[in-house]
Amino acid sequence: MSWLSKLMPSGIRTDNTPSKKRSVPEGLWEKCSNCGSALYRPELEENLEVCPKCGHHMAIRARARLAALFDADSTTEIGARLGPTDLLKFKDQKKYSERIKIAQKNTGEYDALIAMRGLLKGRALVASSFDFAFMGGSMGSVVGERFALAAETAVEIGAPYVCFSQSGGARMQEGLFSLMQMAKTSAALGKLRETGLPYISVLTHPTTGGVSASFAMLGDINIAEPQALIGFAGPRVIEQTVREKLPEGFQRSEFLLEHGAIDQICDRREMRDRLSDLLAMLGRQPAPEVA
């Protein structure tokens, strides 16, 4: 103990007095990438990954999104055991087969699209959602097959279909097999349309490439989340190609709504009620009671 410590009254800590550090669990707080606010993770999850300070829509996992949409304990997964295979033996910096294993381990999913049937306020619904954490939500053979199975299920049970898109586009590691999914998914929607069943496409940030060029823009109603980037090529690629500066907000959902490319913009926290009301109108049914 130093001479200064002896002179200090008890209870007053000097700089060299050891202090007890409180351990804070990792991942308990998250910083908003838009406004910089420190957000309590449990509250952020309850708010569906939307910043309560500025309304910025952060990435949300596919299962969390679908859980927020469907009635509790009403869902059955479609094509759950379908998993990708490396038919082309593709290799870039890593083998495609290795990338699949890493993505499956990190996400706990077999591929980038989750499809389910269930109830929305007591009414039958089929819905699918991309998981961007799985290889950027890229569309390969399994994504296309699950989407087609979901559309077929909707036809079988006479239910509307909703898809939440969040993707960088076709999966390059599957080559032409991935590009074929653009036609496959569009054809599946054609069968759904023949029956007169509604298809609503919800575009989230980002929705680009082959996904935006196929089923993501084929909805009877196309809805986007606020400030979502939607387009085929990214703005930087376009600027480098045309050698011109793009308008501010180009390819964002607000710009697309203003120019008639989408029908509505909806906050994620209001999406369940909005979809329920729209599907009731499209199905010529009375709006369900608020639940």
UniProtKB/Swiss-Prot annotation:
- Sequence ranges assigned to domain CoA carboxyltransferase N-terminal in this UniProt record: 28-291
Positions with a binding annotation for Zn(2+): C32, C35, C51, C54
Cellular component aspect of the GO annotation? acetate CoA-transferase complex
GO terms of biological process kind? fatty acid biosynthetic process; malonyl-CoA biosynthetic process
Documented EC number(s)? 2.1.3.15
Reading the lineage from the top rank, the first entry is Bacteria
Q: Does the keyword Chloroplast apply?
A: no
- Catalyzed chemical reaction(s): N(6)-carboxybiotinyl-L-lysyl-[protein] + acetyl-CoA = N(6)-biotinyl-L-lysyl-[protein] + malonyl-CoA
Class in the EC hierarchy, top level = transferase
HAMAP family associated with the record: AcetylCoA_CT_beta (MF_01395)
Q: What is this protein called?
A: Acetyl-coenzyme A carboxylase carboxyl transferase subunit beta
* Source organism of the structure: Stenotrophomonas maltophilia (strain K279a)
User: Lineage, please?
Assistant: Bacteria, Pseudomonadati, Pseudomonadota, Gammaproteobacteria, Lysobacterales
